[in-house]
Amino acid sequence: MCAGYKILILAYLTTEIWMERQYLSQREVDPGAEFTRNHTISEGTRFKRAVFEGQYCRRFGCCADRDDGCVTQFYEADALCYCDKFCERENSDCCPDYKSFCREEKGWPPRTKPWSPEGCHRDGQHYEEGSVIKENCNSCTCSGQQWKCSQHVCLVQPGLIEHVNKGDYGWTAQNYSQFWGMTLEEGFKYRLGTLPPSPLLLSMNEVTASLTKTTDLPEFFIASYKWPGWTHGPLDQKNCAASWAFSTASVAADRIAIQSQGRYTANLSPQNLISCCAKKRHGCNSGSVDRAWWYLRKRGLVSHACYPLFKDQNATNNGCAMASRSDGRGKRHATTPCPNSIEKSNRIYQCSPPYRVSSNETEIMREIMQNGPVQAIMQVHEDFFNYKTGIYRHITSTNEDSEKYRKFRTHAVKLTGWGTLRGAQGQKEKFWIAANSWGKSWGENGYFRILRGVNESDIEKLIIAAWGQLTSADEP
């Protein structure tokens, strides 16, 4: 039995020695021409290759002793070749430049590190060097395997939205897709557009409504409830800096409809003001409300249906498309057809000189209740763009770089009413109802509520109104 085990062990050792010799001899035996191309390393075998000129070991590096991993691509033969010390045995599977490079007296260069693609990664995706991606309002460039991003303050700040929504501030914020990708400065530049009030406008005497002081003012009032069909909803100025034109045209249209008791209910054209009133006819680059009211008095506007908004406000052919003449009695009549050929009525609507309403909360309420909506000049802060619902009050940015994040600019809106709510603690909260000009997808169907009686964001500082310029034939 013991002799049998010895025979088996001896046979096993003999087989192992034979296989090792066969393995070592593979680099010394040419298996034939059919293996000289298009072969990879077999298990335990390295086939011979055809010899070509080129730099292989010089690029890859040389390896001491036998190293089957010391291999590089032999492009001319579509194969692999070796640069290890085993090549001293005159094997033809070695790279052509092994002898000329690896046998030199100087030290061998280190082996090339395994190739890894250059570039950057973001969200599981690889980007090549020089690639540029957009992250909200900032551009990020892949440079030196790192992302280098601009540091603009974005109009949509997720951190600020979260801060507002987690706090008990009385209103909620939302991320609006139309604002995503814009910087805060771009929001101020394109979504507002009203210039700060001129000294002439601020020096106007305040006028109080003739409504008696004893008249009860309701806790809740909306102009459209008192004058249904005579007031007009919000439009969308898009990226045209013309809140000065939108608010002026809308207030004038409401006032003319109310004064004529529904005889003239057309919404007036802000595009008429944008294209014809502003200097150099570039009204999307901001304008003043006093200039807009001057134009309404001296030149007048056609309806929004007659002169609709241009799709491309930057087009070179957006010059003034309306002309009119005076009849000598203060009324003007259009001398050109409507830019919208479908609309036939090119009637010109005019207003009296504007007047300033008292900044007193009660006086503003009386004016709206007696004569209709008014124009308010307010200050827009960075958080206002994200308003969704509730009673707005400015919430200071939590960002440490306060000077960079806390900014404001002038905006013009239309006040249409007011109301009162009970707060979470049971306290009474008063608010104004205002129409913005950022479309109906923003805020509360295009409207917003804002604290009343405390001049929140200067909403009560400058209130403007006007009468429609109607003749005896126009009035009911």
From Swiss-Prot:
Domain SMB, first and last residues per copy: 59-107
InterPro entries the UniProt entry points to: Papain-like_cys_pep_sf, Pept_asp_AS, Peptidase_C1A, Peptidase_C1A_C, Somatomedin_B_dom
Species this chain originates from: Bos taurus (Bovine)
Signal peptide residue numbers: none
Family annotation (Pfam families): Peptidase_C1 (PF00112)
A molecular function GO annotation: cysteine-type peptidase activity
Site (Cleavage): R49, A50
Presence of the UniProt keyword Glycoprotein in the record: yes
Gene that this polypeptide is encoded by: TINAG
Keywords noted in UniProt: Basement membrane, Cell adhesion, Disulfide bond, Extracellular matrix, Glycoprotein, Secreted
Protein known as: Tubulointerstitial nephritis antigen
SMART domains reported for this sequence: Pept_C1 (SM00645), SO (SM00201)
Disulfide linkage: C63-C83, C87-C94
Subcellular location: Secreted, Extracellular space, Extracellular matrix, Basement membrane
Family designation: Belongs to the peptidase C1 family.
Domain of life assignment: Eukaryota
Glycosylation sites: N38, N175, N314, N360, N455
Keyword Disulfide bond among record annotations: yes
Main function: Mediates adhesion of proximal tubule epithelial cells via integrins alpha3-beta1 and alphaV-beta3. This is a non catalytic peptidase C1 family protein.
Main localization category: secreted
GO BP field: cell adhesion; proteolysis
